[in-house]
Amino acid sequence: MNNNIINLIAAIILSLSIIFGWQYFVVKPEQKKQQQQIAVQKAENLKKQQLKALVEPATGIVVQEESQVQRIKIESESLTGSISLKGLRFDDLILKKYKQDLSKNSPEVRLFSPANTENAYFAEVGLVSNLSSVKLPNNDTIWNSDSEILSPEKPVHLFWVNEDGVKFLVTITVDENYLFTIEQTIVNNSDKELPVQSYGLINRKYIAVEKAVNILHQGPIGCIDENLKEYSYDDIKDKKSEKFAASKVDWIGITDKYWLSSLIPDKSSNYSSNFNYALKQGTERYQVDFISPVQIIKPGENFSIKSRIFAGAKKVDLLDKYEKQYDIKLFDRAIDFGWFYIITKPVFYAMNFFYGYVGNFGVSILIVTVIIKLLMFTLANKSYRSMKKMKNLQPEIDRIKNLYSDDKARLNQEIMALYKKEKVNPVAGCLPILVQIPVFFSIYKVLYVTIEMRQAPFYGWIKDLSASDPTTIFNLFGLLPFSPPSFLMIGAWPILMAITMFLQQKMSPEPADPMQAQVMKFMPLIFLFMFSSFPVGLLIYWSWNNILSIIQQYYINKFN
């Protein structure tokens, strides 16, 4: 039955490889298209008329002309940038706490850029009407402001009055992080009823700089009717538009690996929302937007509605805070924690907790690995004992196989009777591997998708735990003046992982079958090349886990 154990282990390893291959190379199934049968055609036509121009790239606009438009400066601990008073558009935003790369003079990460720039990306909220006679603020409106600077300590109040005397007031606040709150108020001083709808949109010119991988979602995203909706850029490009009619919209936005721009509408109403793609004059634009039902404002009445814009880094604790504070459903799922969300997030919490004490995520990984190892010690102990018993039973198993080679039913019956007599579980040796698979994936996800791990250093030459080991043995770890091709980037940590894996195998019971024993000996070498490009933080975890397993195996061999 030793053959069965080895086959099971090999199957697990193969499954691990297939899962990673699937994550990287197989496009996820097309999501089930939402049925839109209750949309009001009038509202849809209105939205197309009012928002169509916002999807199209700006034409005939000169940068110098844009620079002459007055702006409100944004200044906080986390953000710098400005809001255009023309159209009240959030189109200039820089994240002060994050650099684009690790170089000394690296610029800060820019999130939003004006519509006439190469990387156009902006957000806005406003009002539209189904009556052309109603004069509302639009993209050409120049707003009046009581301040030139928006900060957490100082909100900005804006106003505009149309020719009928209707006053439009907007108050914008920003917190110390990445959340803007926009309150719009209409004071109907006219003698007519005003039908209005509030809307919000995020528009982006997107050019892929690297091949998309299925292990990470990037593109339109949102929580609609308490369900997470994710569409890649390619999905929306193929569909042209994905519509959701009269829904509860907690938030919609566009997500990158580490950054998120999101609209959070007022909870007083349901909204129609869309994920759109448009190609105009060779420029690809993606847009997410929402629009409310018609609200009738009678003469002499006021109407107010509040919306929020999140634009910044996807910090776990920050998204959790906003989700709880403003009841924003599934807001933390903007971070793609993946299949093992129920494990991945607690693993991150554990790492972040110890980081608060040791100040280094690499050390935090070592501590969490020790805790996981202690939790599984009893299971691993039983596993090693079972493997040893299986090795001792191998001669008797071979005898039974020879005796009943022509009768498979009797063969299986006799082998199971032997296991029962000797009190051996043939799959017990594989249980620790099965348990560690979701833990492995969870740690990988934490390293790959969380902003906290981005550019997080360890010691020595490791400056970014989320990136692969930058060294390689093929240029003697930097001593020789050339850079090998990417498939030969076999760094120090991948080598250490392979060595510790080899030593762990040496201390474990060897398969009785010589051929299988030879195959298992090649596994460290296979894994060396297979995982050399993975985040070095994962290799630190794996190497340290192997070292702890060696210590554990030594303890079991000595005292049992």
From Swiss-Prot:
One Gene Ontology term, aspect cellular component: plasma membrane
Primary location class: membrane
Stored InterPro entries: Membr_insert_YidC (IPR019998), Membr_insert_YidC_N (IPR028053), YidC/ALB3/OXA1/COX18 (IPR001708), YidC/Oxa/ALB_C (IPR028055), YidC_ALB_C (IPR047196), YidC_periplasmic_sf (IPR038221)
Transmembrane segments: 5-25, 334-354, 357-377, 431-451, 476-496, 522-542
GO terms classed as biological process: protein insertion into membrane; protein transport
An example Gene Ontology molecular-function term: membrane insertase activity
Location in the cell: Cell inner membrane
Protein keywords: Cell inner membrane, Cell membrane, Chaperone, Membrane, Protein transport, Transmembrane, Transmembrane helix, Transport
Topology within the bilayer: Multi-pass membrane protein
Quaternary context: Interacts with the Sec translocase complex via SecD. Specifically interacts with transmembrane segments of nascent integral membrane proteins during membrane integration.
Function: Required for the insertion and/or proper folding and/or complex formation of integral membrane proteins into the membrane. Involved in integration of membrane proteins that insert both dependently and independently of the Sec translocase complex, as well as at least some lipoproteins. Aids folding of multispanning membrane proteins.
PANTHER family listed in its UniProt record: CYTOCHROME C OXIDASE ASSEMBLY PROTEIN COX18, MITOCHONDRIAL, OXA1
Similarity annotation: Belongs to the OXA1/ALB3/YidC family. Type 1 subfamily.
The protein, known as: Membrane protein insertase YidC
Organism, scientific name: Rickettsia conorii (strain ATCC VR-613 / Malish 7)
